Amino acid sequence: MSSLEDRDPYALFAEWLEEAGTTEPNDPNAMALATCTPEGRPSLRMVLLKGVIAQADAEGGFIFYTNLESRKGGELLANPHAALCFHWKSLRRQVRVEGPVVAVSDAEADAYFASRHRDSRIGAWASMQSRPLQGRFELERRVAQFAARYAVGAVPRPPHWSGFRVVPEVIEFWHDRPFRLHDRVVYRSEGSGWTHSRLYP
């Protein structure tokens, strides 16, 4: 195992993610995303990491996409802070990220949306994410409706669909060790660089 200390945390994360791609049965880029209402009520769900900008400033971060009218979208717009957790059981490793959240640009959202499978683009129009659904048939009816609407030509990005970038103030690396004497190293952003320290397990 490479050292956890005196590293660029983005580079270390990239190494771990690449290794997870060879050992995890599926979705090594899956991450738990925690959001919170302005009143302090948290919620948590799994999403997929779709990009990393490896800069130790406000322009860097971990990117994901979502329906802005979903619960997580609403919470992020009202309280733009989040935490992420990657857990790779096959490697006995975990990475936690904490920081403010900023919206991606329309150009970034358009480019990623255009790269998705056509059926997924139709689904983004059909799904009123996080709102009550009477039954599966209702969802399938909406899918058919939007598939017919966009039967010819490109499927545009819905105005309620975009992405966010979590700008890390904290990145913590955890590696399992025997007898629960695990390795924990936390990096904190400071200006254009990082400081790091070890934590008791």
Swiss-Prot record:
Keyword Mitochondrion tagged: no
Q: Which UniProt keywords apply?
A: Flavoprotein, FMN, Oxidoreductase, Pyridoxine biosynthesis
Q: Note the SUPFAM superfamilies from the entry.
A: FMN-binding split barrel
Citing just one GO molecular function, the answer is: FMN binding
Origin: domain of life: Bacteria
Q: Name one Pfam family in it.
A: PNPOx_N
Catalyses: pyridoxamine 5'-phosphate + O2 + H2O = pyridoxal 5'-phosphate + H2O2 + NH4(+); pyridoxine 5'-phosphate + O2 = pyridoxal 5'-phosphate + H2O2
Q: Which GO terms describe its biological process?
A: pyridoxine biosynthetic process
Protein name per the record: Pyridoxine/pyridoxamine 5'-phosphate oxidase
